[in-house]
Amino acid sequence: MLTFHNVCSVPSSFWLTGIPGLESLHVWLSIPFGSMYLVAVVGNVTILAVVKIERSLHQPMYFFLCMLAAIDLVLSTSTIPKLLGIFWFGACDIGLDACLGQMFLIHCFATVESGIFLAMAFDRYVAICNPLRHSMVLTYTVVGRLGLVSLLRGVLYIGPLPLMIRLRLPLYKTHVISHSYCEHMAVVALTCGDSRVNNVYGLSIGFLVLILDSVAIAASYVMIFRAVMGLATPEARLKTLGTCASHLCAILIFYVPIAVSSLIHRFGQCVPPPVHTLLANFYLLIPPILNPIVYAVRTKQIRESLLQIPRIEMKIR
């Protein structure tokens, strides 16, 4: 294993340990991780295929759902294949540029996903609070622009992270990253220089995205609940709230693991390193696995489309 204690050097590559402390169990750990990754890929590809084929699903909410599925595929694919390579083949080596690229993809698309959830909250707000104008406000062009803005925001916010590491912190105390992927804080901790700027920027962006998006989503749902409470009958209220159930579940699936993982990473000094790494990997896998399931179970149109899989296969052929 490549370690250079007390010597600062410019690395050409890093060595990922996988799940530190559980190296003897890597082969066995590959079974649940490989299975979960397969479920995530199949689920999200199915969502993309169903929405593409069924014209009745060509609506803003389902276009946002497709964006969510594509993001989840990027997030899971940016880490799990490498993790399985470590588990199965001992492929622990990762080039410096590949490491920084992986870091960018993970943090960028997590930020983009948060932006898509905010756009979906806006869609639900317009659909419930101003339904007559929904088709005029949420046009295909507007939906595309909201997705593009979310992507650009992710690139602008996260782009400086690998650049600052590359330009400000070229020297490293060791080439061994005690993690299964190139997480920002794990890489910065290995550097020899003053990393305070990198740490402050990374934390600031994380809290900025988390707090601002959470507050905006919460505000939209406060207005939604006020509009729902103004409906005449309990049945109408339940039916209207039901249109938000999938989105609310997906929000909880996304933000709760982030909050738990961040709190444990910052303040859980007593938590063993394997738990930190396992939580970080589950955080990138749980939303891609559960989002398609939640929307398939809670959304009638998707359920009905999935029941017509044989007809869909005929169309593809």
Curated annotation (Swiss-Prot):
The keyword Transmembrane applies. It is found in: Cell membrane. InterPro entries: GPCR_Rhodpsn, GPCR_Rhodpsn_7TM, Olfact_rcpt, OR51/52/56-like. GO terms for cellular component: plasma membrane. It is a multi-pass membrane protein. Residues 1-27, 78-101, 163-199, 262-276 are extracellular. Disulfide bonds join C99-C192. Odorant receptor. This is Olfactory receptor 52M1. The lineage of its organism: Eukaryota, Metazoa, Chordata, Craniata, Vertebrata.
